[in-house]
Amino acid sequence: MSLKEKTQSLFANAFGYPATHTIQAPGRVNLIGEHTDYNDGFVLPCAIDYQTVISCAPRDDRKVRVMAADYENQLDEFSLNAPIVAHENYQWANYVRGVVKHLQLRNNSFGGVDMVISGNVPQGAGLSSSASLEVAVGTVLQQLYHLPLDGAQIALNGQEAENQFVGCNCGIMDQLISALGKKDHALLIDCRSLGTKAVSMPKGVAVVIINSNFKRTLVGSEYNTRREQCETGARFFQQPALRDVTIEEFNAVAHELDPIVAKRVRHILTENARTVEAASALEQGDLKRMGELMAESHASMRDDFEITVPQIDTLVEIVKAVIGDKGGVRMTGGGFGGCIVALIPEELVPAVQQAVAEQYEAKTGIKETFYVCKPSQGAGQC
C-alpha cells in the first residue's frame, strides 16, 4: 500500500469523511557542500524518492487535528484561537505546531485542518525527515487556503519553526530542497541569496545512500562547536561569513589563526569552491571530475573539519575500490556517523552492494542499510 493510500484510508477511518488533498514533501541527500550552508555558502543537494505524505482537508472551524500514522496513530489537537505551545509528550507534534504557529506569525490567515501524516524518510540517518515534515505541513496549509507563499517562503517558515519552536539549529538547505527539488536534477543553492539553479543529473547514474548505522552521539555538541569555530574565523577576517573570504586571503594569514580554527576555515573555503565546480561537472556529465571533487570533499571533512568516524571512512573506501574513477563517494550530512552518498553508474550498483555486504560488517561489526534513490520532485500534490 502506498503512503497516499495509507493516509487516505486512515483519514476516512479516523475522521469519518474523505480527505480532499494529499500532499508530499521529499527527504534529501546532499551530494556536496558540507557545513557550508550556515557559512552563507553553496550546497548541491537533490530530493529523493522517500517522503512525508499528508492526507488532509480544511475544517469550517479553528481546530487543527493531526494523526501520526507512524507513531501508533497518536492524535494531537489544538486551536488556532489560543497561543500555540509545545506538546508535553509528542515530539513529532511540535514540528506540526511550530510550522502552524510560524505561518500565523507571518500574518497568514487560514482556518482549521484535519491531517493524517505518514512518511518513509529514514529517521536519524541525516536524510532530513524533519524538514520534509515541516515543508509538507506548510504546503498543506498553502494549498488548502491558497496562501500567497512560494516554495522558498514555505522552506524559511519550516526552518524558523525548527530553530525557534522545536529548538534545533539548522541551516536552510534541507527545507529548501524539499520545497524546490526537481525530478532528475540536483539543485545548486546559494545559502545567502537563496537563489537556486537546477543542475541536470547524468543519465544512467544512481544516487546510492548507505547508512553506516553507527549511532551518532556527538552530533549536537560538535555541530555547535564547528559553527562557533567558523564564526571565529569570519570575525578574524572581519567578514559577515566565511563565504566572503578568498582562499588567497586565507593562505596569506593562515599561520596567524588558531591551528584548529584554520583547519575549519580551510574546509569551508575549499568546499565552497568544490561545490560550485561540482555543479558544472554534473551538468557536463563529467562523472570522473565529480568523483574527484567528492573524494577531495571527503578528505577535507576527515582531515580539516574532522567530522568523519572510522566506520564512515571504511564504507567510503569499500565503495571507492569498486567504482574507481567511474563515479564518486563521500560522507554526507552533519557527521559523526550517518550516511555516505555515492553517484554510481547503474550497472555497478549490484557490485557495490555486494562488496559492502561482504566487507563492512566484517570490518566494523555493524550492518549497513543500502538505499538506491532517484532525484525527485519537490513538495506538491500527489
UniProtKB/Swiss-Prot annotation:
GO cellular component: cytosol
EC numbers on record: 2.7.1.6
Residues that bind Mg(2+): S130, E162
Residues binding substrate: E34, H35, T36, D37, Y223
Cellular compartment(s): Cytoplasm
UniProt keyword annotation of Secreted present: no
Organism domain of life: Bacteria
Keywords attached to this entry: ATP-binding, Carbohydrate metabolism, Cytoplasm, Galactose metabolism, Kinase, Magnesium, Metal-binding, Nucleotide-binding, Transferase
Any one GO BP annotation for this protein: galactose metabolic process
Binding site for ATP: G124, A125, G126, L127, S128, S129, S130
Active site location: D174 (proton acceptor)
Keyword ATP-binding: yes
UniProt site positions, description: Transition state stabilizer: R28
Official protein name in the record: Galactokinase
